[in-house]
Amino acid sequence: TRGAELENPEEERFSKLLCNEFDAEEVNLAINGGSNDRIVRNLLVENNIEDYDLAVIQMTFPVRTEFFKDTPSTKFPNGKWFKQPKQAKDAWVKVSPKNNYNKWLHGEDGDIARLGEKFKDHSDFWKYYYMHVTSVKYFETKEKIHYHTIRNSCKIPLVLLTINRWTKLPFDLQLDDGTRQMKHKNGHPNKELHKHYAKQIREILR
């Protein structure tokens, strides 16, 4: 979790509170709207998990994803093409439909009229993908693949969390109980709820 909607996320999010308890250094790689695809990429490609003592990984809604946007080439007057170097991690584009899509997908009251608003690139493609290509079964399978990939790849102590209240998988901790208690306007946990999560994770680690 990045700590969205907190006044001071770097100090108030549960990952920081947990590290304070153990007198440990926090390494938080979360971004707003990140996907399980991004988690697995960071776990298998961008980082070496064995450099750490403990992993607390919060999976998210399986409808989210990402794609790699290559750096465009520029043609100079001499006719030669030059490709501006850019770090690969900066070229990954997140794809995160509004939460109403999750509700609609699972047969709940979710208005998807504005589905494409959060798609910065290829909006028509992603709208078609989410409306006509994917399904609950598809996303459940995708989540299961990510879940077991993380479990099997993490060779250090791991606490695996989720905010997906529709999941059927045995996570160590479910962070969404379906209510809006102790949550901010946009549904993110407030300072007190982050304290509660840190306490729950400590109990799991005992």
What are the functions of these language-model segments?
Residues 1-38, 42-47, 190, 196:
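Serine-esterase "nucleophile elbow" of acetyl-processing enzymes
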Residues 44-206:
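Alpha-helical cap/lid subdomain in secreted, periplasmic
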